[in-house]
């Protein structure tokens, strides 16, 4: 009996390991590692930017540069939003594309990220006086959460563009720590956040290397948060202008609700929610994100394509008006 049980257990374990290995290959992400700065440098036409914490690249404008600087961030994948930086640079803007964790001298994971690293960014911009003002900060997903937190603390920021934003601060993403940690700190103090609940089904899917939709996790996190008011990002403190984008089928978190709430609390923020779009907009989402996108990101192929085209048009209309020659 015992040998038969042992054989059955071994068979099940091997089957699980085999399925997980297949899923790792089947759902592997496309393209370069977003955290690899060498991959950005190899594309050329960039200059490294570095400080004590600040890491990233400067993208000098093509052609006659518009006044000011656009600072861009990506999200929890750890990139510097290279594609968006190049797209904006090609339209005549000086752009700084920055990492905010995962690089040498930075937090290894998206937790305890010191917001005051933006002091270094402002100092770098000031040294390049021809591109000093205005300053627009653009962020995507957790990078949008970062951008909103910077905007309410730094009056030097004139404009913000938030893709798939959050209206609240959420727990940091550090899977090597059992204890909950904040995403951000300010002057060495943690920024209040809503903790993420534990769902066994999510753990199983992660173990099996299957894509996960986290929207329910974030919705439950906010609904159950005893410190909801403290975790709220007080966007009404931001006195500049802003543009907010979301898809109504975002599978990562409730960015559509966040766009509504943020734009209601600050009337200088223009919110746009695209039907049929998910967490990230793309003209070819299959090619760009592979097989993970329907579950993790949401939306439809056509909806995400339309959102990318329409949001790009509106983005450059607003950037052109914010960064006008005087």
Task: Annotate each language-model stretch with its function.
Residues 22-65:
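N-terminal cap/lid segment of alpha/beta-hydrolase-fold proteins
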Residues 161-235:
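Accessory cap/linker subdomain of secreted extracellular hydrolases
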Residues 66-75:
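Short beta-strand element of the alpha/beta-hydrolase
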Residues 129-141:
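Alpha/beta-hydrolase fold nucleophile elbow
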Residues 238, 244-246:
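Short beta-strand/loop motif that positions the catalytic acidic residue
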């Amino acid at each position: 009996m015992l040998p038969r049980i042992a054989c059955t257990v071994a068979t099940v374990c091997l089957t699980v390991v085999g399925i997980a290995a297949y899923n790792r290959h089947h759902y592997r992400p496309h393209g370069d590692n977003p955290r690899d700065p060498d991959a950005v440098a190899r594309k050329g036409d960039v200059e490294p930017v570095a400080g004590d914490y600040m890491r990233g690249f400067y993208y000098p404008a093509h052609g006659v540069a518009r006044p000011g600087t656009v600072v861009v961030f990506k999200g929890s994948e750890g990139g510097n939003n290279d594609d968006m930086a190049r797209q904006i640079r090609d339209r005549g803007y000086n752009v700084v594309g920055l990492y905010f964790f995962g690089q040498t001298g930075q937090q290894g994971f998206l937790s305890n990220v010191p917001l005051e690293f933006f002091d270094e960014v402002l100092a770098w911009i000031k040294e390049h006086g021809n591109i000093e003002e205005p300053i627009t900060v653009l962020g995507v997903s957790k990078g949008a959460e970062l951008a909103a937190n910077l905007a309410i603390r730094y009056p030097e920021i004139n404009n913000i563009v938030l893709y798939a934003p959050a209206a609240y601060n959420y727990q940091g993403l550090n899977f090597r720590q059992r204890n909950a940690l904040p995403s951000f700190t300010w002057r060495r103090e943690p920024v209040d956040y809503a903790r993420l609940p534990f769902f066994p089904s999510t753990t199983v899917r992660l173990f099996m290397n299957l894509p996960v939709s986290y929207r329910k996790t974030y919705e439950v996190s906010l609904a159950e948060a005893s410190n909801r008011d403290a975790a709220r990002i007080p966007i009404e403190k931001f006195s500049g202008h802003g543009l907010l984008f979301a898809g109504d089928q975002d599978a990562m978190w409730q960015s559509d609700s966040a766009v509504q709430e943020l734009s209601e609390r600050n009337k200088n923020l223009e919110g746009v929610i695209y039907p049929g779009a998910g967490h990230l907009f793309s003209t070819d989402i299959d090619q760009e994100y592979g097989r993970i996108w329907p579950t993790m990101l949401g939306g439809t192929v056509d909806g995400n394509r339309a959102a990318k085209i329409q949001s790009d048009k509106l983005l450059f209309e607003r950037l052109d008006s914010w960064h006008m020659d005087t």
